């Protein structure tokens, strides 16, 4: 149990360093130094820097996938599902901004198998989001705009929210959700 806890501490420290410096610029020695231990000691808990990156990104991708699956099962309108997806992104941003930085910027540095798994999860997520948008258009809940433009506009904003949110200090999460949903939806309703 202690090993798992220590591994989680290592991953948390590394994710902060990855966000600050970028994955490529961070060494195992940097991670160890930030934790106040010797680099060799890290290998008792992890295989290497790439494993940390994979755990960060794949765990986050699974969280997005799980959230999407829960939203798809809801008996809500497409518009309500889009609102829930925006809220999902905000919740993840507020709680895991460091991991989001790695997911957005460093996913291509994972092992090939992990990259492939990530790409499948990302493409499935985007396809589900696209389907919800198309249903909203077909039901007249959304303006008849190109679904790709709507998807790109929403996801581009949400994927970079972690950069903006950190710079603005602690905003009330409920206020952020209310305003972000209103701003993004008004442009497509």
Name these PLM-found stretches:
Residues 10-18, 89, 184:
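Short hydrophobic clusters on alpha-helical segments that form packing/core surfaces
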Residues 9, 17-51, 55:
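Helix-turn-helix
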Residues 55, 59, 69-98, 150-154:
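Hydrophobic alpha-helical connector segments
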């Amino acid at each position: 149990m202690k090993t798992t806890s220590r591994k989680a501490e290592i991953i948390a420290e590394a994710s902060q360093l990855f966000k600050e410096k970028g994955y490529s610029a961070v060494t195992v020695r940097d991670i160890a130094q930030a934790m106040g231990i010797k680099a060799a000691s890290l290998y008792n808990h992890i295989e290497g820097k790439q494993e940390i990156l994979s755990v960060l990104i794949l765990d986050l991708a699974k969280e997005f996938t799980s959230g999407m699956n829960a939203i798809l099962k809801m008996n809500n309108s497409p518009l309500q599902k889009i609102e829930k997806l925006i809220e999902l992104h905000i919740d993840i941003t507020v709680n895991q901004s460091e991991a989001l930085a790695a997911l957005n910027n460093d996913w291509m540095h994972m092992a090939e198998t992990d990259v492939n798994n990530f790409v499948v999860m990302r493409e499935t997520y985007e396809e589900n989001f696209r389907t919800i948008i198309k249903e909203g258009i077909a039901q007249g809940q959304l303006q008849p705009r190109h679904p790709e433009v709507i998807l790109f506009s929403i996801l581009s904003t949400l994927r970079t929210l972690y950069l903006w949110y950190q710079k603005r200090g602690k905003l009330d999460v409920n206020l952020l959700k209310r305003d972000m949903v209103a701003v993004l939806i008004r442009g497509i309703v």
